[in-house]
Amino acid sequence: MITNVSPKKWLLMSLGAMLLSGCATTSTDPSRQNVGTTGLLICAQNELCPVVTVSWNESNKELLKLKIHLSSTYNKYEIHKVEFTNEKDFQTFAVTGSTEHDHVLGTNRSTNYILAPVNLMSSLKGTNSIKMNIYTDQGIISRYVYKDGVSAPILGEFQKVYQ
């Protein structure tokens, strides 16, 4: 038996145990499953690295919803459009609305999304690179999805959703 424990500590431990047991027994809503998968692009160590969430567009299964998140300590970005290119062809997509801004753990996060065809990546195959250009009010942020045999994690996420 534990002795010399203050009533305050007992209360905190009891509340913690109830919280953990409540989380462990909460069922998952099936409508929330397969919401989307998230991946990164190929980025250098000191570059802003966009996070992209790929999910189905609920109103049209021929389209994917690509949500782009830009997190920066100093800047908020207005995302205007997104372009994918393999240096032979390119596909440009306008964002669907105004950019959302929030502040998470001391970081500014700018978020917007585009709708793209499910076969986007397969339509850009056949070259040594696929690049994603994000057009913002502060310039173009260019990062690779695929380059010289190296795939960004987001390419695998596209393939998971496409299957």
Features from the language model and the residues they span:
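An ectodomain-focused feature that recognizes extracytoplasmic/extracellular
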Residues: 25-78
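Acidic surface patches and DE-rich sequence motifs
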Residues: 44, 57, 85-86, 136
